[in-house]
């Protein structure tokens, strides 16, 4: 995995210096302004851990109940009703899969959002292209594809070409086609390693149906083969990929990279906006984008499984900790949350967060927008009821701050001597908050 981190870090540094332009003498007094876009933490890791812990707790509880008497008739009747309702919902999900889920599976649905000016749209950034490269998800994935393709064709380091191809495979394909391609490519390379003297294992006919369906149709599949030493050659009307390297030792390391591959980390961009409120104006709950609610087919199935687990929970004795986890799971259907923070001076800032980011990410976000004079000032974040968050490691979903929330900044000291609230680089983006927002 270190090879992927090294590759990402190297390309991030290269991108940084490309965008920095010409050097500036330290004595010249010139400096570059900081951008106003902020990126969120990568999402998703907490769901699996919570779900796994919950299932383990249920299994342990069932073992404790082995010797309890059988359920009475009333309890069995409740189970029958619940199961019948779940079957009806399952049929509805299946109907969606057959007739109407294509609209939910559009990879570029971020491009068709219709909502108020409170949220322009959900945007993303990546570790590979840098936090300042902010796009819709579809556009960002296309940019990642183009960047990695350039690396494969232009890189002098053979290992960089392999890593770039692996990143393409893991970042730009769905799970099943990706796994099928990786399995097939591994077989090609393993055959060469296991049978070094047999030329038949070093040649792949491009017209072969299995190759076309399993490898050629997957983004990065052929690129990986070419990166490890396969070259296109013609024999009559047929075309082949032929392994032409004199040595196959490098295939061992390439296979390890392929099996242990990872996707380019993509994060939701903060999309910072700052509003100036009129005297007495109160911000309303914003209208949210479709992305905050739309669920894919896989997410619908996950919701179905959650409902089945809920029925099981209703029919078993739950500890306080188990009930708290149940409440947390109900928020996982939201992908993002819009956090608005009220600042002194009738200012209102807002940013987009992943629901599974910790509350501490909001504190970092607020601190990063404050002026130099306030950058070291102590402050607290309170909700509408003036309640403090005690555990800032808790996720925004766990704190019921999804799909939108309004917080207030309270400074520990008097601000009369500090003047400007937000940093200079953010002054120009301040705008009036429309009444509808």
From Swiss-Prot:
Protein name, UniProt field: UBX domain-containing protein 6
Subunit organization: Interacts with cdc-48.1 (via N-terminus) and cdc-48.2 (via N-terminus).
Basic residues compositional bias, start-end: 7-18
Induction: Up-regulated in response to starvation (at protein level).
SMART domains linked to this entry: PUG (SM00580)
Domain UBX: 332-409
One Pfam family hit: PUB
Residues in coiled coil: none
Biological function: Probably acts as an adapter for ATPase cdc-48.1 and/or cdc-48.2, conferring substrate specificity. Involved in the lysosomal clearance of cellular material in diet restricted conditions.
Organism, as annotated: Caenorhabditis elegans
Tissue expression notes: Expressed in the pharynx and some head neurons.
PUB domain ranges (all copies): 179-251
Cellular component GO terms held in the UniProt record: cytoplasm
Gene ablation phenotype (knockout): Reduced lifespan. Prolonged expression of the lysosomal protein glo-1 12 hours after starvation.
Region (Disordered): 1-45, 89-109
InterPro entries: PUB-like_dom_sf, PUB_domain, Ubiquitin-like_domsf, UBX_dom, UBXN6_PUB
PANTHER family: UBX DOMAIN-CONTAINING PROTEIN 6, UBX-RELATED
